[in-house]
Amino acid sequence: MKSTQSQCAQERQGHPISRRTFIGLSMGALAAWLAGCRATITAQPSPITPPTPTSPPSSTPTPEPSPAASPAPPSPPSPTPTLEPSPAAPPSLPSLTSHWPATATSRVVVVRHSGVWVGSAPDPQIVLHMLDAGISALSDTADVLAVWRALSAPADRVLLKVNCISAGGPTQPAVAYAVVRRLQDAGLSAENILIFDRTDGELAAAGYTLNDGGPGVQCHGARGEGSVAALTQASVRFYQDLDAATAIVNIPTPKQHGSAGVSVALKNHYGSVNRPGALHGNWCDPAIVELNAQPNVRDKTRLVVGAALSVSPDDWNRPARENALLISFDPVALDTVGRDILVRHRQARGGDAGSLIEGARHLGTAQKLGLGATDVNLIDLREITLG
């Protein structure tokens, strides 16, 4: 091939070649070209054996992570509350309302909505929406009416214990009326519902419509003294209205208290007896716990709904807006969450929150006596923001 190239180069340089030499060179080039084509045609790719359908190609297995290294599954979302009946079996009252120490923890649900206030008044529809969301999260049940039916039978006489001792920071009527609405939706007659606090005057000043014996929801103060509660510090009498009730929904509002540290669900029942002043010694401890342990309170209480749309961290007539409802079956756990909210607001105002914590010593006594949980490790806190 080198000689051929040399000869071609010579031809390009103008050196003549003979006819015989030209024919020889041409035949050699043709032979080389044919040899290349033959090599191309015969060099077919090696055949590939397709995989057998019943025997797929094996692969090296990927090692599974150890269980300890697996991330914890996310918490399931709260069910979407609905008023449509559920095909599932309705919850039973004992299983629904159980809390610590009968269960491992006590659940408290905090539902917030930044738009709940319209000027100086709460929006009733938003409050009702907050209540539904809280009941659904508390019970892990989307069918909120099934929960209310479990909490009250048609023949029950349900007392809603509100707190109206201060016109500046009472239980907001919109919260009590939302509870009334759902009790009626669940089948309870309006006449079997009583919105109650110790005096007519305090109820009226807080914005409630009084009704004593007329058609519709009842609303009035105490109507006479009834059964005795013999406590360590003093003997007091429940008002007859507590004796007559077969079920209680406790609807307090969180506020500071000079003799108890805080007043939320437990302290609210000082308005259920005739001589509350006799129970204020030693930071209301253990009187406040013993009172709530009485069958007239403990056995009848179905639910606690903390009206924390506004709270009173220092001055009852200077409330702070929290835009929240606190909902639980455990009054001690709810009071603990309410106390922490009061602490936050007082500190935000530059105040010392020590008395709120040290003064609420009855919470520890309540846990020791099995009334509910105040230890943070025993409280299952669920917080929901709707808007």
Residues of each region from the PLM?
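N-terminal entry module detector
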Residues: 162-164, 182-185
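Extended, low-polarity segments enriched in aliphatic/aromatic residues
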Residues: 89-154, 171-177, 184-387
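Ser/Thr-rich, Proline-interspersed low-complexity disordered segments
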Residues: 40-97
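Short glycine-rich or small-residue beta-strand-to-loop segments that form or flank ligand, phosphate
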Residues: 157-167
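N-terminal secretory signal peptides
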Residues: 1-17, 28-35
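Glycine-rich, N-terminal phosphate-binding loop of Rossmann-like dinucleotide-binding domains
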Residues: 26, 162, 252
